[in-house]
Amino acid sequence: MKITSDVFEAYLKCPTKCWLRATGETFAGNIYSEWVKAQNDSYRESETRRLVAEFPNNEVAVSPDMKNLKAAKWRLASSLAVQAQIDSRALESGLHALERVPAEGRAKPTQFIPIRFVFTNKLSKDDKLLLAFDAFALSKSLGREVRIGRIVHGDEHTTLKVKTSAMSSEVRKRVERIATLLSMRG
């Protein structure tokens, strides 16, 4: 069973929607939700371009291989597919962007900061939980804790730093509930 960021997001809104998304059901077409998705996709695209422009070309990677993440030389990556296994559950998240902060000393590991783009000016708890899900999947994939993440949002490109490690237990509970839901109905 695979729990993706789309399935996780659907669960935050409604367990039935989660079930439908996980089983591949097609949706009848909610005009508002389609508009919100289009706005978020457009915002993600433009903010990714803006963020990439802030880094030298040799420090940016698009869809890098996750196998060599710890040894990577880039400082910013976009469009990263993260996969991890927890018990019998597969987690999969499409990171909007990932910043790699090199270690300051030999004893400290390189820090990875997931970045999520949200077009709205006001963030919801769900936005923070989605970032925490990204960080949770990334931490399981790397085998180490991802403590913080960032959300870039709104007209002013406001950046919010989120302590994702503080939200990991809530993400784990939701992942377990999703797994239970999908196994009961499947």
Where are these regions (language model features)?
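Polybasic (Lys/Arg-rich)
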Residues: 177-186
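Nucleic-acid nuclease catalytic cores
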Residues: 86-176
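Metal-dependent nuclease catalytic cores that hydrolyze phosphodiester bonds in DNA/RNA
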Residues: 1-107
